[in-house]
């Protein structure tokens, strides 16, 4: 009976990833990565392990709906980076979607705003057409540096989604931009 009412967002995303050729599997519950990006008002639905990727795990978070608000989901992509401790803690950027008419209009453009500590991420991500297209279609994206038990970066998508091959390749591309950002900063100093 409990299985019938359980939220299957994690199972569905795992199935979608395998369908497009990404080798993914469900991790055991109470995985250490379930706490990454998890706030008091959210609960983790579990982690998906991804093989042969710069994003080795995905955590799915949910905020249950209330009387006046629907449930919400966040998809957290983990990007490990041992060099992250060298980068300033303020690194946190997110997409700003500009609409033709406030609230209801079509999305005309996507830019990145926030603090990238001179890494050049905002400029790199803002001019990439594939990343703009992904953000227009799937929602807001946010990149944060993590310095706790998990050392690296998180890419957070603020809703459920069913990835296509192009979506996954673009997410991998974002991860590669993030992982190469320190080299850009080092070149700039010279």
PLM feature segments, named:
Residues 1-91:
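Charge-rich, low-complexity N-terminal segments
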